[in-house]
């Protein structure tokens, strides 16, 4: 273990490894502060379950457009650098909203202001996630490709540790601290992340379009370059002739025009780079072997209404479960997630993705049935406590969700064509996040339609029954997944 860490330090440097671990730890530790947000919406603002779910859906939308951040950072350098300036910007966007919400009572007492600040905060977090992923990809490519898996393992481990710590401390903090204090405490991590950005050195980037996308746009680039060269040459000849007549005045005008030309050329390069990246990404995504599986994963999210926020209200209001216990339940969920990852990697990689996804959806329906048992109070008749049901359901639900998510990760990674893996993978993750967002909107709409609100959960059982039925809708579209694809092969 120590030897392995020394190898990573030698390959990537302490500063880079520290930044990677800190960013991913912060991503996991977000459960510490977002639990407080849930209680702020429920207890302080007294929003209904559907209204709270709507706020969360809007606030997490920035995670659905991650490729946009990647393309911009790839194509438009700031100060000659493509990564660290954007990492600084994203960290500031992550830091400032929590400071404002912690210090200003008006901002956290208005659902609109709170939603805006939470959206800005998620914009910063999503951008930081994209930038650090790009930095990892570049570091692996420039240093040692053999450490690619190791670096990913370090990042996932850091996020898991952050998730466990955030869930444990979040429940304790809510029982002993004010919500605004929790917001302020969380700012320590983004502030530390901001300082850590100064430790990482980045080489100046050239201002040329993305090399991996140039091949697919070679003809357009050549034609644009040739068309631009002719007027530029004639203009420079004209300036030289005028300069011979006008002397020093002509020289100064020539310098001014040269500077304008260079600025225009730089802007043109940025535009062409953005254009190449966008069109290259679009062409790759439109290939049936990529489009069809991604369509299935999107359908799998939007056809199943997400009632997690409604269940949170039910657990706190009807079952009277406190914040400390719910934090423990989230820790158990993280352990279930890691267990699901182990089970898939150890036993299910050779299973076809169609079969593993079918079993995953059957398992998801079972977890919803457990919620139905909890809502019907049938567990009490058999001597099973509510806390036992919640803990078991949390572990099982997160494990099964991970069994469903692992095929998505594997298929996404294997379908990405060489050269644009990072940006296309970010697009895949954005589709997954967008599907989650739409599913949350669907859940909010279902709760509103059934009249489920704070203090009124009479139709909760009906909502869960509808959710169980919807869980099997994506099974009808499994033909979109490659028939023989497994965790080892995507073909």
Curated annotation (Swiss-Prot):
Residues 237-248 have a biased composition (Basic residues). It is a multi-pass membrane protein. Signal peptide: none annotated. Residues 222-262 are annotated as: Disordered. The chain crosses the membrane at residues 14-34, 52-72, 84-104, 112-132, 154-174, 179-199, 294-314, 323-343, 356-376, 389-411, 437-457, 461-481. It is found in: Membrane. Keywords: Membrane, Transmembrane, Transmembrane helix, Transport. GO terms for cellular component: membrane. The keyword Membrane applies. Residues 249-260 have a biased composition (Basic and acidic residues). It comes from the Eukaryota. NCBIfam families: fbt. Belongs to the major facilitator superfamily. Folate-biopterin transporter (TC 2.A.71) family. Could mediate folate transport. This is Probable folate-biopterin transporter 4. It comes from Arabidopsis thaliana (Mouse-ear cress). The lineage of its organism: Eukaryota, Viridiplantae, Streptophyta, Embryophyta, Tracheophyta.
């Amino acid at each position: 273990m120590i030897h392995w860490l020394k190898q990573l330090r030698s390959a990537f440097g302490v500063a880079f490894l520290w930044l990677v671990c800190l960013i991913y730890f912060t991503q996991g530790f977000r459960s510490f502060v977002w639990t407080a947000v849930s209680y702020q919406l429920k207890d302080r603002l007294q929003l209904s379950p559907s209204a709270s779910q709507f706020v969360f859906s809007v606030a997490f939308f920035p995670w659905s457009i991650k490729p946009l951040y990647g393309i911009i950072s790839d194509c438009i350098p700031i100060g000659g650098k493509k990564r660290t300036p954007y990492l600084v910007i994203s960290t500031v966007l992550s830091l400032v909203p929590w400071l404002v919400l912690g210090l200003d009572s008006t901002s956290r007492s208005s659902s609109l202001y709170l939603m805006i600040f939470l959206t800005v905060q998620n914009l910063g977090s999503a951008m930081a996630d994209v930038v650090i992923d790009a930095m990892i990809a570049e570091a692996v490519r420039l240093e040692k490709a053999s450490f690619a898996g190791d670096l990913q393992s370090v990042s996932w481990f850091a996020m898991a540790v952050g998730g466990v710590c955030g869930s444990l401390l979040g429940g304790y903090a809510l029982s002993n601290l004010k919500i605004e204090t929790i917001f302020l405490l969380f700012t320590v991590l983004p502030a530390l992340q901001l300082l850590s950005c100064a430790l990482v050195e980045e080489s100046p980037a050239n201002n040329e379009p993305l090399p991996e996308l140039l091949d697919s746009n070679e003809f357009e680039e050549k034609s644009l370059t040739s068309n631009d060269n002719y007027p530029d040459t004639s203009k420079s000849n004209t300036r030289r002739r005028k300069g011979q007549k006008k002397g020093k005045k002509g020289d100064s005008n020539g310098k001014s025009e040269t500077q304008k030309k260079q600025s225009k050329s730089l802007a043109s390069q940025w535009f062409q780079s953005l254009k190449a990246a966008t069109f290259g990404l679009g062409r790759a995504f439109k290939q049936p072997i990529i489009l069809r599986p991604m369509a299935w994963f999107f359908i799998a999210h939007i056809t199943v209404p997400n009632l997690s926020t409604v269940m949170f209200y039910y657990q706190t209001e009807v079952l009277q479960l406190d914040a400390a216990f719910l934090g423990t339940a989230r820790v158990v969920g993280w352990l279930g997630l890691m267990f699901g990852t182990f089970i898939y990697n150890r036993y299910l990689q050779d299973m076809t993705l169609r079969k593993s996804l079918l079993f995953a959806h059957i398992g998801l329906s079972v977890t919803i049935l457990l919620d139905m048992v909890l809502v019907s109070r049938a567990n009490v008749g058999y001597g099973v406590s509510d806390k036992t049901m919640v803990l078991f359901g949390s572990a099982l639900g997160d494990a099964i969700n991970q069994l469903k998510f692992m095929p998505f990760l594997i298929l996404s990674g294997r379908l990405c064509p060489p050269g644009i893996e990072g940006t296309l993978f970010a697009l895949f993750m954005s589709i997954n996040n967008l599907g989650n967002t739409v599913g949350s909107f669907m859940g909010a709409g279902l709760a509103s339609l059934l009249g489920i609100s704070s203090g009124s959960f009479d139709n909760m059982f009906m909502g869960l029954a509808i959710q169980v039925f919807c869980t099997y809708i994506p099974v009808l579209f499994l033909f979109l997944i490659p028939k023989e694809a497994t965790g080892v092969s995507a073909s």
